[in-house]
């Protein structure tokens, strides 16, 4: 048994520069990215190992964290560390092209895959919720979801408002690690936004990092600001301290009409992530310890009220969509039979991108030098010269996005381009243009790496929403291809029982061997997304598979 102490009063910051603390960059990289996940600029509650998303942790407890760090510093380049739900459980001899770390987080046999059983295991120190990029050590702060949210808002603007969100406003809630991206994404897309958040500390953090522009004093003040800025055609984001389950019904009652409605509260985790209406945060946390069943019930009842208000907006013809936190499922379990009347964001706006393997490609500069990221930004523009939309994103990102922890960048690119960029970055390390290696990873929210019937795989054309072979195959292929670390998780985004997903990270250290691994992994990884969607019958994916020369025996053979 290990010490299940999850609190330590300490500040962690990844090493910078090009001096190694481990034996090679292949082990230095996961070490730095683990530490970066717990940087106070990055993590929501680093002293309790919580990175984002309710209780998404980087390690099971502090004893496990210490042992992971110790093991990574001694790991050889023909050894692989196995991490089981945030606990380092073994080091085995493999080979130099194998992953240096293999991670499995939060996985439960399906019959027991629910929050009640997971919470029992967590309390005993036998499990850890890894979310998606918390336990896989590739979280880069809210930037990691900004572009995906931006792409969603832009596509919604195309579909509903003739391509322009000028003078429009988005109503949403949640300013945590994921939801905190919403105000900036809306601003970049040209819209105002009203962002409800129940924790003042989260509002303060988003103001400090320039993800949100202003805070209103109360609802009347917020609506007055929205009216002023939309009339002026300005894109300003406004935070409001309050509870969405109280404020959304009040807006419906007043006849207020937003132009778009969504939500990114941590509704996936009623015990830890959604404050019941009428409760203080302190009451919520205290009662979670003493009467968890009552807390879950109260949170889900409030979610039902919240979703009913969203349905009311939808009935008025206002574009309304779930942004992947499973709030519709929670409301349905509380008796809101038509909770799924409004769609999720993936089938509504994102799936055509997934069909081409396009998703959240990200990289981080292990040097800690922002100039390394700016140089890679320029390289992306050079190699993809004709994509004005992507260039605009990179320009806006440089101007508006504050780095959190190690400098990083995200841009949505797909099959073909990911490998091209990865190989170019590796050459930049080789030539000394970059001052230290970079790591390339992605969110588990990607085209071929997740099965989540209420989010990424909602309403698949062939009805295969719940088939979870695909992320397993993705993880196996990335392991075979030589990713530096590979992860396989359960329950990220939408909570226990509702998703399985995999992640990969690969190091660009400037070597020939790295180039070979990069070419394989950054082709195969998005390739599985095209494969998955082609198999489901999407013509865009079938065409992409043929154009890119994928060997899909039942489709291209």
Swiss-Prot record:
Active site: 411
Note describing how the cofactor binds: Binds 1 NAD(+) per subunit.
Pathway: Amino-acid degradation; L-histidine degradation into L-glutamate; N-formimidoyl-L-glutamate from L-histidine: step 2/3
Organism whose genome encodes this protein: Pseudomonas entomophila (strain L48)
Pfam families, sorted: Urocanase, Urocanase_C, Urocanase_N
Function: Catalyzes the conversion of urocanate to 4-imidazolone-5-propionate.
Subcellular location: Cytoplasm
Transmembrane segments: none
Keywords recorded for this protein, A-Z: Cytoplasm, Histidine metabolism, Lyase, NAD
Top-level taxonomic group: Bacteria
Family: Belongs to the urocanase family.
BP term (GO), one: L-histidine catabolic process to glutamate and formamide
First-listed, main subcellular location of the protein, grouped into a coarse class: cytoplasm
Binding sites annotated in the UniProt record for NAD(+): 53-54, 131, 177-179, 197, 202, 243-244, 264-268, 274-275, 323, 493
GO molecular function, one term: urocanate hydratase activity
UniProt cross-references to Gene3D superfamilies, sorted A to Z: Urocanase like domains, Urocanase superfamily
Matching HAMAP family: HutU
Protein name: Urocanate hydratase
């Amino acid at each position: 048994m290990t010490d299940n102490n999850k609190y330590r009063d300490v500040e962690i910051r990844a090493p910078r520069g090009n001096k190694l603390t481990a034996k090679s960059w292949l082990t230095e990289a996961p070490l730095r990215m683990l530490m970066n996940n717990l940087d106070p600029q990055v993590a929501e509650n680093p002293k309790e190992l919580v990175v984002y998303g309710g209780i998404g942790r980087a390690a099971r407890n502090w004893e496990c964290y210490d042992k992971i760090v110790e093991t990574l510093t001694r790991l050889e380049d023909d050894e692989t560390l196995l991490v089981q739900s945030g606990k380092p459980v073994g080091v085995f001899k493999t080979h130099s092209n194998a992953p240096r770390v293999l991670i499995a987080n939060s996985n439960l046999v399906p019959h027991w895959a629910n929050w009640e059983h997971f919470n029992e295991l967590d309390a005993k120190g036998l499990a850890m919720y890894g979310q998606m990029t918390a336990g896989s050590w590739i979280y880069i702060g809210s930037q990691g979801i900004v572009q995906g949210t931006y792409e969603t808002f832009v596509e919604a603007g195309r579909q509903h408002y003739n391509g322009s969100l000028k003078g429009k406003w988005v109503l949403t809630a949640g300013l945590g690690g994921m939801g905190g991206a919403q105000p900036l994404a809306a601003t970049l897309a040209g819209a105002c936004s009203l962002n409800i958040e129940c924790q003042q500390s989260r509002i303060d953090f988003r103001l400090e990092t320039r993800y949100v522009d202003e805070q209103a004093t109360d609802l009347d003040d917020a609506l007055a600001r929205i009216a002023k800025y939309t009339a002026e055609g300005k894109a300003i984001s406004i935070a409001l301290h309050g509870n969405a389950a109280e404020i959304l019904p009040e807006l419906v009652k007043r006849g207020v009409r937003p132009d778009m409605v969504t939500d990114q509260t941590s509704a996936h985790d009623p015990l830890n992530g959604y404050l019941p209406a009428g409760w203080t945060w302190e009451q919520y946390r205290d009662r979670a310890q003493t009467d968890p069943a009552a807390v879950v019930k109260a949170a889900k009842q409030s979610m039902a009220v919240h979703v009913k208000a969203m349905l009311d907006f939808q009935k008025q013809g206002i574009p309304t969509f779930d942004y992947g936190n499973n709030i519709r499922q929670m409301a349905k379990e509380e008796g809101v039979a038509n909770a799924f009347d409004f769609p999720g964001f993936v089938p509504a706006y994102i799936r055509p991108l997934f069909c081409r393997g396009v998703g959240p490609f990200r990289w981080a500069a292990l040097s800690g030098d922002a100039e390394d990221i700016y140089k890679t930004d320029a390289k992306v523009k050079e190699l993809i010269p004709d994509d004005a939309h992507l260039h605009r994103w990179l320009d806006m990102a440089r101007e508006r996005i504050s780095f959190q922890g190690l400098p990083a960048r995200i841009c949505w690119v797909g099959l073909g381009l990911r490998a091209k960029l990865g190989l170019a970055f590796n050459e930049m390390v080789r030539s000394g243009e970059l001052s230290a290696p970079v790591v390339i990873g992605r969110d588990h929210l990607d085209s071929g790496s997740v099965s989540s019937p209420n989010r990424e795989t909602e309403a698949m054309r062939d009805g295969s929403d719940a088939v979870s072979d695909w992320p397993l195959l993705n993880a196996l292929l990335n392991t075979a291809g030589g990713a530096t670390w590979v992860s396989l998780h359960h329950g990220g985004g939408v909570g226990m029982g509702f998703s399985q997903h995999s992640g990969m990270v690969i190091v660009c250290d400037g070597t020939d061997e790295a180039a070979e691994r990069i070419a394989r992994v950054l082709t195969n990884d998005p390739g599985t997304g095209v494969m998955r969607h082609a198999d489901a019958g999407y013509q865009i994916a079938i065409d992409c598979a043929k154009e890119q020369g994928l060997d899909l025996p039942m489709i291209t053979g």
